[in-house]
Amino acid sequence: MPAAPVLRPPPPPATPAPPAPSRPAPPIPGHRGPCDHSLKCLSSKISERKLPGPWLPAGRGPLEKPVLGPRGAVMPLFSPQSSLHSVRAEHSPLKPRVVTVVKLGGQPLRKATLLLNRRSVQTFEQLLSDISEALGFPRWKNDRVRKLFTLKGREVKSVSDFFREGDAFIAMGKEPLTLKSIQLAMEELYPKNRALALAPHSRVPSPRLRSRLPSKLLKGSHRCGEAGSYSAEMESKAVSRHQGKTSTVLAPEDKARAQKWVRGKQESEPGGPPSPGAATQEETHASGEKHLGVEIEKTSGEIVRCEKCKRERELQLGLQREPCPLGTSELDLGRAQKRDSEKLVRTKSCRRPSEAKSTDGEEGWKGDSHRGSPRDPPQELRRPNSNSDKKEIRGSESQDSHPQGAPKAQKDLVEGPPAVEEGPIDMRREDRHTCRSKHAAWLRREQQAEPPQLPRTRGEEKQAEHEKKPGGLGERRAPEKESKRKLEEKRPERPSGRKPRPKGIISADVEKHYDIGGVIGDGNFATVKECRHRETKQAYAMKMIDKSQLKGKEDIVDSEILIIQSLSHPNIVKLHEVYETEAEIYLIMEYVQGGDLFDAIVENVKFPEPEAAVMITDLCKALVHMHDKNIVHRDVKPENLLVQRNEDKSITLKLADFGLAKYVVRPIFTVCGTPTYVAPEILSEKGYGLEVDMWAAGVILYILLCGFPPFRSPERDQDELFNIIQVGQFEFLSPYWDNISDAAKDLVRNLLEVDPKKRYTAEQVLQHPWIEMVGHTNTGNSQKEESPNS
């Protein structure tokens, strides 16, 4: 009897060793794992996992920087048991990273590149502050960086989010992030990418692309950028890209449908036009509907009968097979279904050749070049890019001023407060023109919302018709015509209808009449130089405005010229002449040699009551003249008050800089000005008028008497400052106000009144006892000093 075999216990399963960081674990014999290829071949086999962004295209042209995945690194699709690391070492949070941040809101956009380390960043607030400083927006400015977004529109809310979200970010202030903002940021970051240039003009995907997308996505039940309940299905049908080629995993019904369409197409190609079966199948892909194309023909009531329509049908099918960038948003997919079905029905109708050429979208392109060279982009694709880019620039301006639902928006402008565009409210002197340049959009909107033009007399109509005749634009107007034209330009209802400035005058003509000297001031898009007339030797200030930096802000200069020409007062800077060339605009203005009041305050700190009374008197006289014409300055501050030193050693203030001035025909809701001098009704956004200038006059009077402003934030926090201003909380601190008269304090209280209806007007200030007593006393003393000299 044979011996029974000895039963040996099975060997215990080998405990898998922990994966070494530098080398992968050896593969198990007989098992084919994902790591049995060489590492050189492995890089070409890996498919990258990237969540689809809301619109980010994936064109053939390489980006200058790789747009990384949601965690800031390229993650191969390995199983969790694989010993290969899924995150590259160079994207480790511990290693310093170079990031690029784009700040939107101005032209040109601000872009900064920073080298950041995770260990050096303590808090997210510190990170935002550092980025804001690098972009040129200190933390006390109103348009500082408040939020960070990724290129996919996801908000960064913590330091850890920032260090795993990629290498490029979008910085925003209080304004919301829009799809247009993301597009502008992408064009700034990757200006040479062809896919970005084509993406805004190819939002409707081709039927071939639509057939690759999941059916649920085409129905519009899910969003493209969300990871919802269908994430497992999306992974099974994921679209993987490698070296510009697209491999797709289709559902069984979609694959059968595509194979049937390919067989029908191959059978129809030798004979000419595609077969009706193939055409109807293609229609099913294009429209994304369940019924067949034959049913579409029946419901449309039109049948393909002529050869011309067959050729157009073939042309349409050839266009539909063209690839489209994969960055089309899901909202556009939903809108494209109805539009594509309408195009198919319209293509079947028997049209004349002239009508066939007028089709829109892709039907307007020629299909022969598409079929002849499907891989190389034809010239017809490149040509619309330059034109469409120009249209896009104009469109962005029109979108700012005319959003969707234009009638309703215009009604809102008249009846209620519009959406406030945050503009910089700067208290530094070198940036005094920033607020004006940032608010060009709302200036245009408000000017467009002005009331209709007042009826003109017959004489004015004849004069206007005579000036519209050809040949009168390039000639010099007579002084009488100039005065009549200025009278017409005083009307607030015609800010953009001002007669054109003299044309055909080049820079040499300006230099022919004036000797141009050195620079005495500058702003965002203008430089002020001293000049002297060659014949009269009279000194003037020449404001030279660069038109290349003024694109989209022309109305600001036109409004400023219009208002200055309508004003004539000894306490207001006069405009002498206006010249315009192809490159620049020249404003020849009165030259005040004593500097501005800001310099005088820095030099003297504070002024005696008589001198302060004279300065406030000059300011209020100018404001009386302006307010009588319903013109509000909106930027009254020491920097805009020029000091003229007279021969009798007295001074005269002249109001200047009318870039924010505006005719008041209804309450204004635009937030603008300078923080220290801004009125509370501007901040409350409930509508304001002429009274805001008097609040600023009260702040200036307070500074003249004690040397510091009435409203201050110890931490220089602008939000805190605005809250203090809205409450109207100020006090006469001791010992600075101990020697100031009660009459002066009473005038300050009446000017710094929160209620605009109770606030003093300019005429009431001139009638105040302190002004009449102290101001006249100072004037009498100056006259007595002048009499012995004479």
Swiss-Prot record:
Top EC class, one word: transferase
Active site: D635 (proton acceptor)
Stretches the record annotates as Disordered: 1-37, 201-290, 315-506
Ranges of compositional bias, category Low complexity: 201-218
Binding site for ATP: I520, G521, D522, G523, N524, F525, A526, T527, V528, K543
Chemical reaction(s) catalysed: L-seryl-[protein] + ATP = O-phospho-L-seryl-[protein] + ADP + H(+); L-threonyl-[protein] + ATP = O-phospho-L-threonyl-[protein] + ADP + H(+)
Gene transcribed to yield this protein: Dclk3
Protein name, entry field: Serine/threonine-protein kinase DCLK3
